[in-house]
Amino acid sequence: MFAKLESLERKYEDLERQLSAPDVVSDQERFRKLSKTHSDLSDVVAAFREYKKIAQDLEDNQEMAQDPDPEIRELAQAETKALKEAQVELEARLKVLLLPKDPMDEKNILLEIRAGTGGDEAALFAGDLFRMYTRYAETKRWKVEIMSQSETGSGGFKEVIASISGDKVYSRLKYESGAHRVQRVPATESQGRIHTSAVTVAIMPEAEEVDVAIDPNELRIDVYRSSGPGGQSVNTTDSAVRVTHIPSGLVVICQDEKSQHKNKAKALKVLRSRLLQVEQDKQRAEQEAARRSQVGTGDRSERIRTYNFPQGRVTDHRINLTLYRLDAVLEGDLDELCGALIGHYQAEALKAQADAA
């Protein structure tokens, strides 16, 4: 591990020299790429330099520990204990920083929320989840843009698709995909019985044209008049667009914009991300099948999280984490949940790395 860290530090220092060279500064594209690599290495290099400083301080403390003055020896022992604890924490952090990076982590995302079982109550909860993610995005200064929505008369969503753009959006939200279950008493329930409903969430890295090439000959594009809740027409022109990707059968409908051109652009953006997700899911399924053949399966991904309103709790079933602050979570306070999930999957990756060694 330390040989790799030394190599990364040398690379970091070389990048610093290159970034100050006039020929690099004058080449914007090259400067941008080198700056990105330099930025990517900054955390691990800073942690490694701190680790080396602690190692040097420990070495210096050995001399103090031999001092004839008992007070100085006692002080050295206390400092050594604190330094060793910091060294252990830093070593663990360095192992995480050296894990292979998910190439999608830097990407923006498409968020898809669909009401599942539970009728109107599921649609209302789909709206609650969309507001939750929107508020979380606001705290991170991310930009949210609705791509497509299908509202219900009760104020919920049958489906809503939005793009979220900003700093490392996918890395924070990628573990939100799955079935979210809600348990609460509907406003229309006269007996006070708790109903259980489900909503599915999909987090897809936003694909760019370089990620997924779409052959125009493989698309069928239909245009028609937009319609709102209940089927009423909201537009007198054929501005709604339905794009069908013939080889995969994927269909995307966009009708939120008054312009047919804008709806088509949004639909293609969603389609591109869905095709990228299909390819990623295929690769993950192949990897998971290989893993299951060796270690068996314990799949609990169907229901990833439960939101229980009577108890005011949120439980993430993948990591057995329960928080008794449902209101704060639904207001967009997701950092503890997201952080715990990221930590869990980093630990899983470290274990897999150790098992393979």
Swiss-Prot record:
Leader peptide range in chain numbering: none
Keyword annotations: Cytoplasm, Methylation, Protein biosynthesis
Domain of life: Bacteria
InterPro entries the UniProt entry points to: PCRF, Pep_chain_release_fac_I, Pep_chain_release_fac_I_sf, Prokaryotic/Mito_RF, RF-1
PTM text: Methylated by PrmC. Methylation increases the termination efficiency of RF1.
Basic and acidic residues bias: start-end ranges: 282-291
Chain intervals for the UniProt region annotation (Disordered): 282-302
Residues with PTM N5-methylglutamine: 232
One GO MF term: translation release factor activity, codon specific
Compartment list: Cytoplasm
Protein's UniProt keywords contain Protein biosynthesis: yes
Protein role: Peptide chain release factor 1 directs the termination of translation in response to the peptide chain termination codons UAG and UAA.
Family assignment from sequence similarity: Belongs to the prokaryotic/mitochondrial release factor family.
PANTHER family: LD18447P
Name of the protein: Peptide chain release factor 1
Origin species: Solidesulfovibrio magneticus (strain ATCC 700980 / DSM 13731 / RS-1) (Desulfovibrio magneticus)
Gene: prfA
